[in-house]
Amino acid sequence: VRYSPLLHLNEGLVYDEIVGAVQEGLDLARRQYGIVCGQIICGIRHISAASSLELAELAVRWKGRGVVGFDLAGAEKDYPAKDHIEACLYVLNNNINITIHAGEAFGAPSIHQALHYCRAHRIGHGTHLIEDLDLMAWVNDRRIPVELCLASNVQTKAIPDLQSHPIRRFMEEGLRVTLNTDNRLVSGTTVTNEYRLAVENYDLSEDEVLGLVMNGFKSAFLSLKDKTQMVDQVLTEFASQGAAFSGEISRRRRSQI
């Protein structure tokens, strides 16, 4: 669950109460339905670096109690990621993973900043990575996950239409591509719908669909043990769907997380 507590300070609520309330819901989901979910706390680029640092400190306080990562979201243009470097370094120094929205509403230099200044472990959107092939190769070589959001990118005009999205090129180059919703409420989408859009618009094979699913689990901000268990569960589920996936499943069982 990725959100900014800064946007929920209503009726006297304070940061720790907000995170605690969210965690109660996630704990209940895990007990009742077996859903495993962590919290990613977001700083907001266009609000202030000071508030991002407060949220970074909040993330560190809740490390080991549900918070698994820190994000930097909000307007890219005129609000560079490097302005929030203090917040990013604070969470890094406390061994918390970082993902940063970059390359959605601004070009490849925004992605470069997120990676080389703020040292992000994942890139949110990354649509404009296609504009810098050298940086794209660097991202690929380091298996940095790229969190693509198809419906959202069309709605925000990051791309003119789905046919213009670089997902197919990214996949052909071997990038660790994942499919995401961005904002379910604003975009009116689901993870299932994002996969439907991908299959219908980019002629994905069954093996490619499995690859995208696996990339998502491999890129999760979870422990190696938890990710390994989830990957095994997913492969077992796909195996139950028939022989179509058998060759790819055998290969992926041998691959590294």
What does each model-found stretch correspond to?
Residues 9, 44-50, 74-80, 100-107, ...:
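Short, small-residue-enriched loops and turns at beta-alpha junctions
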Residues 124-127, 132-181, 234-257:
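Active-site neighborhoods of metal-dependent hydrolases
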Residues 1-11, 36-42:
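Divalent metal-dependent hydrolysis catalytic cores, especially in the metallo-beta-lactamase
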Residues 70, 101, 123, 146, ...:
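Conserved, mostly hydrophobic/aromatic
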Residues 19-31, 35-38, 51-69, 78-100, ...:
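Histidine/acidic residue-rich metal-binding segments in metalloenzymes
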Residues 203-257:
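Mid-to-C-terminal alpha-helical segments outside catalytic/metal-binding sites
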Residues 161-216:
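Flexible, acidic glycine-rich loops studded with aromatic residues
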Residues 7-17, 77-81, 117-124, 152, ...:
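Glycine-rich tight-turn/loop motif centered on a GG-T
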